[in-house]
């Protein structure tokens, strides 16, 4: 009796093995549908990722476009109001050796060819700023500022950027040494009055944190002996001229900038090779055309010492700043 009871108890406790382990599997059609749905999801995610990457690159391009436009607008004001007089020094502009007219003793000026990034300083009828605690009062403040542009390391990021100085001036120099200066005239040169003009002057401010390269050339005026042309000499040698003479031979200053956005700069560790890979301006040649040909080349990343991702984001911009054709005469 005990054996019979145990048999029926086990039979009741343990169900039929087929009924316990049999489960329904996926059909071939269901597997195919699942694979199609999965493929569609993968494609959608990939498309969203690609769209995000394109949008990110477009945003970086818009950032550099906007920065270049703002810089050029500021330069247009500065160059448009630049004093162009035969008795003012322009030796900070790029030029070969020059000889001043007999009016100024035929003084010889050394060549200033500026290999690498260019720089310049000039007087302009625009607002200037006084960094000291004092400034000229009333009519003692001159409506002229000393403007300068150069490429230098940004004090915050430590990377090359476009720096601008707008130094306020007085009609007369201040009694306190270094508080402010006045406009000086030939034969005195700007670098003599401001010895740290391009080397540590505290009045420089960053106006283009994406700019790492600056070059400019001169568009000479049409004359009976020569057609208008791009030149690194700011006077027409075919007319026998030997000095800038208030930009009397120059129709426009042509400024070319190279920019690299802040995001791309995070993977750049040296700008020396990058800067030298974009050649200096040359006579009869558009700097922007030469630079664009360089950055669009297949070997640019290698020659510039850049990661490919950063090299593809280098942008070139150029603008002509036409000068007033009426030369201002000296008193």
Kindly give the residue locations of the regions a language model identified.
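Surface-exposed loop/linker segments characteristic of extracytoplasmic
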Residues: 98-223, 247-252
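N-terminal leader/signal peptides at the extreme start of proteins
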Residues: 1-26
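Short secondary-structure boundary/capping segments
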Residues: 2, 55, 271-274
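Short, glycine/small-hydrophobic-rich surface segments
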Residues: 57-58, 63-64, 79-116, 225-231, ...
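Short, charged/polar micro-motifs that form catalytic or ligand-binding hotspots
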Residues: 31, 61-65, 139, 201-204, ...
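Alpha-helix exit/C-cap motif
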Residues: 47, 51-55, 70-94, 154-158, ...
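Aliphatic-rich helix starts adjacent to a transmembrane/signal segment
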Residues: 26-80
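Short linear sequence signals and composition-biased patches located at protein termini or domain-edge surfaces
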Residues: 87, 113, 199-331
């Amino acid at each position: 009796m005990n054996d019979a009871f145990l048999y029926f108890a086990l039979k009741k406790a343990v169900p039929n093995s087929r009924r316990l382990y049999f489960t329904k599997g996926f059909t071939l059609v269901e597997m195919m549908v699942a694979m199609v749905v999965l493929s569609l999801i993968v494609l959608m995610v990939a498309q969203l990722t690609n769209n995000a990457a394109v949008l990110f690159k477009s945003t970086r391009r818009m950032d550099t476009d906007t920065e270049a436009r703002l810089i050029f607008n500021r330069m247009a004001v500065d160059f448009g109001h630049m004093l162009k007089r035969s008795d003012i020094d322009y030796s900070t502009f790029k030029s070969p050796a020059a000889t001043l007219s007999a009016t100024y003793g035929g003084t010889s000026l050394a060549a200033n060819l500026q290999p690498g990034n260019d720089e310049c300083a000039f007087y302009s009828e625009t607002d200037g700023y006084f960094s000291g605690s004092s400034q000229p009062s009333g009519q003692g403040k001159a409506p002229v500022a000393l403007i300068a542009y150069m490429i230098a390391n940004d004090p915050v990021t430590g990377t090359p950027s476009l720096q601008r100085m707008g130094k306020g001036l007085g009609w007369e120099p201040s009694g306190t040494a270094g508080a402010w200066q006045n406009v000086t005239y030939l034969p005195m040169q700007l670098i003599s009055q401001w010895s740290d003009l391009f080397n540590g002057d505290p009045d420089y401010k960053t106006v283009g944190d994406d700019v790492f390269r600056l070059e400019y050339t001169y568009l000479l005026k049409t004359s009976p002996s020569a057609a208008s042309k791009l030149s690194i000499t700011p006077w027409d040698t075919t007319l026998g001229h030997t000095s800038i003479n208030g930009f009397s031979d120059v129709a426009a200053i042509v400024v070319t900038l190279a920019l690299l956005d802040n995001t791309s700069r995070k993977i750049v560790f040296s700008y020396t090779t990058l800067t030298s890979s974009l050649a200096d301006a040359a006579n009869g040649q558009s700097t922007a055309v030469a630079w664009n040909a360089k950055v669009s080349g297949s070997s640019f990343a290698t020659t510039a010492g850049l990661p490919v991702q950063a090299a593809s984001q280098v942008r070139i911009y150029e603008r002509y700043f036409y000068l007033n054709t009426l030369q201002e005469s000296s008193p």
